[in-house]
């Protein structure tokens, strides 16, 4: 039986500076079978950042040019806000290049600086990927908000 595997990576940054002190929000959807069902995430700035991050993660009201892969529905159902933050950084690490099917490991983190966020995201990816795929984990996205570096 041939199984088609697709990794759903969705990353969109929607910037709405309606209030300079508004938090950034990160939403993630990672099913137990990330290898077969992929994963999704979204983040946004602004007063309604949580709603926007969830919408992006779920594939709702996507900005022009962003396409959600067909088999992302299970990951989308699991989308949840994992953090609101100001003057911090977040990172996503995966064991395959962006838009390539078949991830075994995905990690994410929010921290005071990019180095810490990236280190924690890599550790999460390596733990999920297991011994055979740990070395393939790499930070695929790292973003800082406000004064964080």
Kindly give the residue locations of the regions a language model identified.
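N-terminal signal peptide c-region/cleavage motif recognized by signal peptidases
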Residues: 13, 18-20
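Secreted/extracellular ectodomain signature
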Residues: 21-149
């Amino acid at each position: 039986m041939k199984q088609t595997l697709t990794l759903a990576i969705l990353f969109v940054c929607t910037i709405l500076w309606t209030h300079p002190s508004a938090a950034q929000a990160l939403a993630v959807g990672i099913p137990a079978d990330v290898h077969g069902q992929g994963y999704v995430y979204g983040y946004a700035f602004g007063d309604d950042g949580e709603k926007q991050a969830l919408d992006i993660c779920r594939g709702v009201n996507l900005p022009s040019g962003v396409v959600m892969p067909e088999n992302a529905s299970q990951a989308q159902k699991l989308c949840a806000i994992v953090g609101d933050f100001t003057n911090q950084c977040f990172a996503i690490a995966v064991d395959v290049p962006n838009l390539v099917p078949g991830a075994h490991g995905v990690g994410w983190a929010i921290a005071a600086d990019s180095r810490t966020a990236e280190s924690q995201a890599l550790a999460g990816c390596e733990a999920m990927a297991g011994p055979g795929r740990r070395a393939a984990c790499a930070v695929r996205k790292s973003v800082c908000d406000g004064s964080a570096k």
